[in-house]
């Protein structure tokens, strides 16, 4: 077990041209396992069910992850207490437990710990810059106490709020990454990806990119736009992408949360492990060196990324001991037609069927078009009432 501080830092690795592999999507994975509630998507499980969070960290580590992100997504006090969410633990307890779990597992391998903050109800409700930064600072105090290796501001729909987060995180002197949940159209205020990236780098981010909301190849395209703009501005940064594990060709600016299938019927859109290998290769070719995943990414997806880039990294992940590359393990199958699939060209050419003959291949995004400052996005501590839900149901029914 490597002691804290003895490992090479994330910037040292990236500056050397190495690939850093992130982890996957904790809130979706743990919701499916029964440890996170869909709706608030908050990370109480770090304190309530540490064994579940620890095991998922461990599976991502075995799959090839170099970074264990603390399970602190939506762990700001204002989000933890939003819309009637009831807590058995304080925000500080949840953040501390998440840091301890990430460090415990990171020390089982050559992995770093990243403390993460994300967008806040305070910003959506038009609170001041000072108030929003104070919210980030409360989480940051825990990350400093627990001596995380790097900091990530992730899942921001508005570059302005992400800038505020980066400014707070940068004051620590630790490496800072910043990822927006945007596609090629830019943030929810219409700021294009390139401008977003330049602003984040000027705010102090060492690593910039995107996470969530869109599929891998869309995210690679978006980060390529960021990279071009940063270089044109004469600035320097490293680049990262942690996309969805879902196909989103029909998504608009809001991404997958605008799809009618969100969040309980997305399974037909899941990428195969072979498509993840394509993602890893395209990201690498685009000059992206921090490559991970977000919602929908399971450990086998991360293993596919690590296997695709094994030549560049110089090794295979531990979990590949139980996985034949490009299906080669199928040589051992009892059925001859399955043994015939033990080859790369079979899986690369396959176009998987959904088995749903009455379902469309594309959806129409809801397209409500609301963002910061809209009455429907003003947040509250009290539970959502039936009176508040009724007009939302009516508006949704009118669209479908």
From Swiss-Prot:
The keyword Zinc applies. Coiled coil: none annotated. It is found in: Cytoplasm. PROSITE patterns: HCY (PS50970). One of its GO terms (cellular component) is cytosol. Its main location: cytoplasm. GO terms for molecular function: betaine-homocysteine S-methyltransferase activity; zinc ion binding. Transmembrane segments: none annotated. Involved in the regulation of homocysteine metabolism. Converts betaine and homocysteine to dimethylglycine and methionine, respectively. This reaction is also required for the irreversible oxidation of choline. This is Betaine--homocysteine S-methyltransferase 1.
């Amino acid at each position: 077990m490597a002691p804290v501080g003895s490992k090479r830092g994330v910037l040292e690795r990236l500056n050397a041209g190495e690939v850093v592999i992130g982890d996957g999507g904790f809130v979706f994975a743990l919701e499916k396992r029964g440890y996170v509630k869909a709706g608030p998507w908050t990370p109480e499980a770090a304190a309530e069910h540490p064994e579940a969070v620890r095991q998922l960290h461990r599976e991502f580590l075995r799959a090839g992850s170099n970074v264990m992100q603390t399970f602190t997504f939506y762990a700001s006090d204002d989000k933890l207490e939003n819309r009637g969410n009831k807590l058995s633990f304080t925000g500080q307890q949840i953040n501390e437990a998440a840091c301890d779990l990430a460090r415990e597992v990171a020390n089982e391998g050559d992995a770093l710990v990243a403390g993460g903050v994300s967008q806040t109800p305070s910003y959506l409700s038009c609170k001041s810059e000072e108030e929003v930064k104070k919210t980030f600072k409360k989480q940051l105090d825990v990350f400093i106490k627990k001596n995380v290796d790097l900091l990530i501001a992730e899942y921001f729909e508005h570059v302005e709020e992400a800038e505020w987060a980066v400014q707070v995180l940068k004051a620590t002197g630790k490496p800072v990454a910043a990822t927006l949940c945007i596609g090629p159209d830019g943030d929810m205020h219409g700021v294009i990806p390139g401008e977003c990236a330049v602003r984040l780098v000027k705010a102090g981010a060492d690593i910039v990119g995107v996470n969530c909301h869109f599929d891998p190849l869309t995210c690679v395209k978006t980060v390529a736009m960021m990279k071009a703009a940063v270089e044109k501005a004469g600035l320097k940064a490293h680049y990262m992408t942690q996309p969805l594990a879902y196909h989103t060709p029909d998504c608009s600016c809001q991404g997958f949360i605008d799809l009618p299938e969100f969040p309980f019927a997305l399974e037909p859109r899941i990428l195969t492990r072979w498509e993840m290998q394509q993602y890893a290769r395209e990201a690498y070719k685009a000059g992206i060196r921090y490559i991970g995943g977000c919602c929908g990414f399971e450990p086998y997806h991360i293993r596919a990324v690590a296997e695709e880039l094994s030549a560049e990294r110089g090794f295979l992940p531990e979990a590949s001991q139980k996985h034949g590359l490009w299906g080669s393990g199928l040589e051992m199958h009892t059925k001859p037609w399955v043994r015939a699939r033990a080859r790369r060209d079979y899986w690369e050419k396959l176009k998987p069927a959904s088995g749903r003959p009455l379902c469309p291949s594309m959806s129409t995004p809801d397209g409500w078009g609301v963002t910061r400052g809209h009455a429907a996005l003003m947040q509250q501590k009290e539970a959502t009432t039936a009176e508040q839900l009724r007009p939302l149901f009516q508006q949704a029914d009118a669209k479908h």
